[in-house]
């Protein structure tokens, strides 16, 4: 059974010139509550509608500018709350924002199939392959384009074998990045969004990492005191 969670909103007409794009949006005639549903079918339908929207980039830019804090709701600019949070941490950690024009190019019929076939690679590896094919791009732009076509776009690469536990693999591949994120004040939710990983998995990884750090510190202090 699918549980639906809706956060009701009211539609308000705006006469602001900066908000004029809203009247051209594909969702302007839709029930706004549907864009705050967590039902799987609603998410897929809403993201598909966003991809056909002529003002998807304006919507995403406005939403990223206006959102702050812990609370993000609904589908905006073709992205879920977690995906938009990931973009926030892409910028904080690497100083990179997606190139919206290039992302739109990547989801056109000419490039969409190519992008889809690269979706099992890391965003960095996919960006390199696209560069070889003639598109100069970066990891965060690739992530955005992958999200728009319904692919994961995760920085945590899909597991090839089940022999290695997920927690071990996350720590083996990404301990330095986890440390950087935590040093910048990232919560478990933030780290999970950045990697595209389940929050419980990130919680276990961070707990193990911090436990190891405490043990190392205690050992160092004991050696210095000896």
Which positions does each model-derived feature cover?
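Short, charge-enriched, intrinsically disordered boundary segments that mark the beginning
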Residues: 2-25
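Short Fe-S-cluster ligation motifs
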Residues: 12, 21, 76-102
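Immediate flanking context of iron-sulfur cluster ligation sites
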Residues: 17-54, 65-68
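Short, non-ligating residues that shape and space the ligands of small metal-coordination modules
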Residues: 59
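Short, amphipathic alpha-helical "recognition" segments used to contact nucleic acids or chromatin
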Residues: 103-122, 167-186
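Short Lys/Arg-enriched helix C-cap and helix-to-coil transition segments
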Residues: 147-170, 180, 210-226
């Amino acid at each position: 059974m699918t549980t639906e969670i809706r956060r009701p909103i009211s539609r308000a007409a705006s006469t602001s010139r900066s908000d004029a794009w809203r009247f051209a949006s594909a969702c302007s005639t839709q029930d706004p509550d549907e864009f705050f549903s967590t039902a799987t079918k609603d998410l897929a339908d809403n993201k598909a509608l966003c991809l056909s929207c002529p003002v998807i980039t304006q919507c995403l830019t406005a939403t990223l500018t206006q959102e702050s804090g812990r609370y993000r709701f609904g589908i905006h600019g073709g992205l879920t709350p977690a995906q938009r949070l990931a973009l926030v941490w892409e910028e904080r950690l690497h100083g990179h924002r997606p190139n919206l024009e290039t992302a739109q190019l990547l989801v056109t019929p000419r490039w969409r199939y190519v992008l889809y076939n690269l979706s099992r690679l890391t965003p960095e590896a996919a960006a390199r392959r696209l560069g070889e094919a003639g598109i100069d791009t970066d990891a965060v732009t690739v992530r955005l384009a992958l999200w728009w076509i319904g692919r994961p776009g995760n920085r945590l690469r899909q597991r090839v074998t089940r022999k290695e536990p997920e927690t071990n693999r996350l720590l083996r591949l990404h301990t330095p990045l986890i440390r950087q994120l935590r040093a910048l004040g990232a919560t478990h939710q933030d780290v999970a969004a950045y990697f595209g990983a389940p929050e419980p998995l990130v919680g276990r990884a961070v707990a193990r990492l911090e436990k190891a750090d405490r043990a190392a510190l205690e050992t160092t202090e004991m050696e210095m005191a000896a």
